[in-house]
Amino acid sequence: MKQLLNTAINAALESGKAILEIYHSGVFDVEIKGDNSPLTKADNVSHNVIISFLTKTDIPVLSEEGKSIAYDERKDWKQLWIVDPIDGTKEFIKRNGEFTVNIALIENQKPQIGVIFVPVTGELYFSTKEIGAFKVKVDLKNYDPETLISKGNKLPLFREDNTFTIVASRSHISPETESFVQEMRDNYGAVNLITKGSSLKLCIVAEGQADCYPRFAPTMEWDTAAGQAICECAGFQVIDWNTKESMLYNRKELLNNWFLVKK
């Protein structure tokens, strides 16, 4: 498992380097996909870099920017990588820095390894069931995955402010989310609300900066798999709103149900 974690970290960091080159160039070549979401040159470049690492593991890969794989082909996969080469493409285009690279290893529908890299800040989040969840700052000019793993700060981190804190989407605050926030205000009195793009919301809960993350709007498996792995290893739950159980992966329908991340 440690070697697979090293591979996923290398893939995320090298794709982060490639993304930053395009980010700083300002030439994004934006297209609109069939689902009306944006696609940039950086999404495709990141996908290709990640695939070049993960194919060496002989574990199949399901990527947002890869070819569509029929359920009949993948339903018997015991292991697979689930990848979002750039989570938060809208944030990338807006140049606000709130986009991530997400890589997860799934075994028997459950997240086992999670790696999330934030290229603009150099923050790397990673987890396995054996070692737990960690955060470390990366210098992309000079790094070694083994050293990074040993230097990581174990999650959750200490938080001074005990005010009940909710993190929610910057781009997708639904009426149901607003109702949930109001319900928490009724329960707890003062409530802090943080808004962020991409899988940073899951990272913020795993860090202990927020108490919960309600997501009552559409997401796909590649948006959440890595973040769920990290949250679970930090002691949080990612609960499917319909089943009231932990979210499972490599389902026939890759669109997630609503979910709630909490202790």
What are these regions (language model features)?
Residues 73-75, 93-97, 127, 252:
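Short glycine/proline-enriched turns and hinge-like loops at secondary-structure junctions
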Residues 44, 66, 171-172, 218:
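Short, surface-exposed acidic/glycine-rich loop or hinge patches that mediate macromolecular interfaces
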Residues 1-12, 16-17, 148, 178-187, ...:
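Oxyanion/phosphate-interacting regions
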Residues 1-86, 179-182, 196, 203, ...:
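N-terminal subdomain of lithium-sensitive/metallo-dependent phosphomonoesterases centered on the IMPase/IPPase/PAP
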Residues 104-202, 246-247, 251-263:
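Acidic beta-strand-loop-alpha-helix segment within the catalytic core
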